[in-house]
Amino acid sequence: MNKVVNNAETAIQDIHDGATIMLGGFGLCGIPENCIAALVKKGTKNLTCISNNAGVDDFGIGLMLQQHQVKKMISSYVGENAEFERQLLSGELEVELIPQGTLATRCMAAGYGMPAIFTPAGVGTEVADGKET
């Protein structure tokens, strides 16, 4: 499989409704702006987005939130997006908050094909409630 594509539309063509996608970058730096724009244009819905943040209004994942394309957000920081807050408080958006280091460790484990990994972060806190420890 050739991993090099000519444009964002080609890069996202196999992302379907209900897919789980991981978006890179840190804050607003290094995010896949063109791929996000292509997903907005394509109208892909019910996405689970994994990212260290939820973007801001009118930029990044915030654009997909405005179009109600995100069903679930898995993130370590979500504090700068008013639309995110509105959808969360209205029950439209499912959210899984994860400490930054744990998020990075989970992504690494997934890359290695590991179905689970233990990290002591969060043990004995609300993060661990309802989870096997």
Which ranges hold each PLM region?
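Conserved alpha/beta enzyme-core scaffold
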Residues: 1-133
